[in-house]
Amino acid sequence: MALIFDIKRFAINDGPGIRTTLFMKGCPLRCVWCHNPEGFDEKPVKMYTKKKCIGCKTCVEVCPQKNLVLTTEGIKDLGHCTACGKCTNECPTLALEMAGKEWKMEDLMAEVEKERQVMEESGGGVTICGGEPLMHTDYLCEVLNELGKRGFHRTVDTTLFASPEKVKKVAERCELFLVDLKLMDSAKH
């Protein structure tokens, strides 16, 4: 099982047509220019958006680890979060959110199916990116197989930072690879 940290609907830059993009957690790279650093870690990560915080201290009060304090700069994490999710579940303004959730296959497919008509009419489909989706080849292949059974166009957006065997296994289950070339070194390439 792998975690998905975001689902972006009506995406137009992640493959042909209008798409639903699934963002998987975990990436072995640490690119300083990464657009999705919340996808680095394979585990859930608590995210804080200061401008959404109203200073109600609900998160401080419900945290069983006593990990959060309210300061003049907003909520401060003391560094011993267990990612239990109690603070994120109780935050009334979503200033605290958990990036990363396990999805049962039927629930994930139900989310994707919501946009079927738009995807079909636009020639779109589903794109899986990350993080680096090839870190979770078995789970990725399960998702791709299920999408294929349902007739969705399947795209994987990847750095290809994986073994040739993993790349081949995934390539057999999707119609398109989008490859992010992260760095070119003429001495190595």
Task: Please identify what each model-predicted range represents.
Residues 42-173:
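Conserved Radical SAM active-site core
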Residues 22, 31, 132, 156, ...:
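Conserved, mostly hydrophobic/aromatic
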Residues 171-185:
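Non-cysteine beta-strand/loop elements that form the S-adenosyl-L-methionine
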Residues 43, 185-189:
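A short acidic, helix-capping loop that chelates divalent metal ions and anchors anionic groups
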Residues 5-58, 74-83:
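N-terminal pre-triad scaffold of radical SAM enzymes
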Residues 1:
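Iron-sulfur (Fe-S) cluster-binding modules
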